[in-house]
């Protein structure tokens, strides 16, 4: 274990034997740091926070602070961060609320760039990238492999489906379908995240099926519900298309982000 002499570690904190804590960092009494965690200088980890193995946290990040919620009265709530995340300078991640889920959950293998923020009760998947200054309001749910551009923001309770792309400066006030690409303020659906799908090695047949389903789903004929039912019938055997259908059919707190002509 490598602890800089200027670091402050609460005696009750649970640190794996190979954890590194850099200069002027602070680790609170209800914190657990798994194997291989590295806190660089001036990092604050407080609250009931667990950081998974191999995470690297850069200077001036604050993890496990209380939720920015007027109803919070100091109840014990948690922040759980999965393994192998890179958390850059000035990132903030807050614990949950007692009136919500009570826990904020971060998946594995993510990149959280400078100044990005994850608010209370969020659920973030694996391999997620939040670019510089990206912000998640409370209770936001993000699927795996989402890329959120610089200074983009997601409204509280919104859902962002797997493999979707959020353009820089976008204001996401509605749910984003899996594999979608959204831009603008307020954000609107521009199409599918074809670049991301190709980079992740999706087969051509799957991409073609997603494109066909998207064209039908957002066509001009019939009602949206009728078109959605047609997509579900035609592509019943395609897992990725049905993921979009199921996402849309799931009861949600926010409306669906649509192409501009559908808004």
From Swiss-Prot:
Record's GO cellular component terms: cytoplasm; membrane
Lineage: superkingdom: Bacteria
The keyword Transmembrane helix belongs to this UniProt entry's keyword annotation: no
CDD domains: LbH_UDP-GlcNAc_AT (cd03351)
Keyword set, alphabetical order: Acyltransferase, Cytoplasm, Lipid A biosynthesis, Lipid biosynthesis, Lipid metabolism, Repeat, Transferase
GO molecular function (one): acyl-[acyl-carrier-protein]-UDP-N-acetylglucosamine O-acyltransferase activity
Reactions it catalyzes: a (3R)-hydroxyacyl-[ACP] + UDP-N-acetyl-alpha-D-glucosamine = a UDP-3-O-[(3R)-3-hydroxyacyl]-N-acetyl-alpha-D-glucosamine + holo-[ACP]
Main localization of the protein described in the UniProt heading: cytoplasm
Listed EC numbers: 2.3.1.129
Pathway: Glycolipid biosynthesis; lipid IV(A) biosynthesis; lipid IV(A) from (3R)-3-hydroxytetradecanoyl-[acyl-carrier-protein] and UDP-N-acetyl-alpha-D-glucosamine: step 1/6
Transmembrane segments annotated in the record for this chain: none
GO BP annotations, alphabetical order: lipid A biosynthetic process
Annotated localization: Cytoplasm
Pfam families: Acetyltransf_11
HAMAP family hit by this protein: LpxA
Role played: Involved in the biosynthesis of lipid A, a phosphorylated glycolipid that anchors the lipopolysaccharide to the outer membrane of the cell.
Family recorded in the similarity comment: Belongs to the transferase hexapeptide repeat family. LpxA subfamily.
Subunit structure: Homotrimer.
Protein name: Acyl-[acyl-carrier-protein]--UDP-N-acetylglucosamine O-acyltransferase
Naturally occurring in which organism (per UniProt): Caulobacter vibrioides (strain NA1000 / CB15N)
């Amino acid at each position: 274990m490598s602890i800089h002499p200027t670091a402050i570690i609460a005696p009750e904190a649970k640190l794996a034997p190979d954890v590194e804590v850099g200069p002027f960092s602070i680790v609170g009494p209800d914190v657990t740091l798994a194997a291989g965690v590295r806190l660089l200088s001036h990092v604050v980890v407080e609250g009931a926070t667990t950081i998974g193995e191999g995470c690297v946290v850069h200077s001036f990040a604050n993890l496990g602070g209380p939720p920015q919620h007027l109803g919070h009265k100091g109840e014990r709530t948690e922040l759980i961060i999965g393994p192998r995340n890179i958390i850059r300078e000035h990132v903030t991640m807050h614990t949950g609320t007692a009136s919500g889920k009570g826990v904020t959950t971060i998946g594995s293998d993510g990149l959280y760039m400078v100044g990005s923020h994850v608010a209370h009760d969020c659920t973030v998947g694996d391999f997620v990238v939040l670019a510089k200054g990206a912000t998640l309001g409370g209770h936001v749910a993000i699927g795996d492999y989402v890329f959120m551009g610089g200074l983009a923001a997601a409204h509280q309770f919104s859902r962002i489906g797997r493999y979707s792309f959020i353009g820089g400066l976008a204001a996401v006030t509605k749910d984003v379908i899996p594999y979608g690409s959204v831009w603008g303020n307020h954000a609107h659906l521009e199409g599918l995240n074809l670049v991301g799908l190709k980079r992740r090695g999706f087969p051509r047949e799957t991409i073609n099926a997603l494109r066909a389903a998207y064209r039908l789903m957002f066509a001009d004929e019939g009602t949206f519900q009728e078109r959605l039912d047609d997509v579900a019938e035609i592509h019943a055997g395609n897992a990725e298309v049905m993921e979009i259908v199921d996402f849309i059919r799931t009861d949600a707190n926010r409306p669906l982000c649509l192409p501009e002509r559908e808004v």
